[in-house]
Amino acid sequence: MKRLALVLALLTVSGLAHAKKTCTDQPKEKWMKEEDFKKRLESEGYKIRKFKQPGSCYEIYGTNKEGKKVEIYFNPVDGTVVKEVVE
């Protein structure tokens, strides 16, 4: 019984870790336009391989100005980084 409880607890924590990020609670009317945001990132040296809009975030997969692979979640209203993974 203890083993089952442990497995269920681990699955619950694992599920929470993979939940979508909340980047903003602002309505989409206040978000930057995707094309304008992409241009801004490219002007900062990012090369965008994939651009997504999961939930309330803008997310990119690509490389930064140093050429390192990145996965970054941005607040689509002001462009701040919410989460960044650099390989």
Where are these regions (language model features)?
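N-terminal targeting signals for Sec/Tat export/insertion, comprising classic cleavable signal peptides
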Residues: 27-56
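Positively charged n-region of N-terminal signal peptides that target proteins for export
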Residues: 1-4
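Conserved histidines in hydrophobic membrane contexts and catalytic metal-binding motifs
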Residues: 41, 60-63, 74, 79
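A short, surface-exposed interaction/processing loop segment used at functional sites
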Residues: 81-87
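Glycine-centered tight beta-turn/hairpin loop motif at sheet-sheet or coil-to-beta transitions
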Residues: 65-67
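N-terminal signal peptide c-region/cleavage motif recognized by signal peptidases
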Residues: 14-16
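Hydrophobic "anchor" residues
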Residues: 69, 80-81
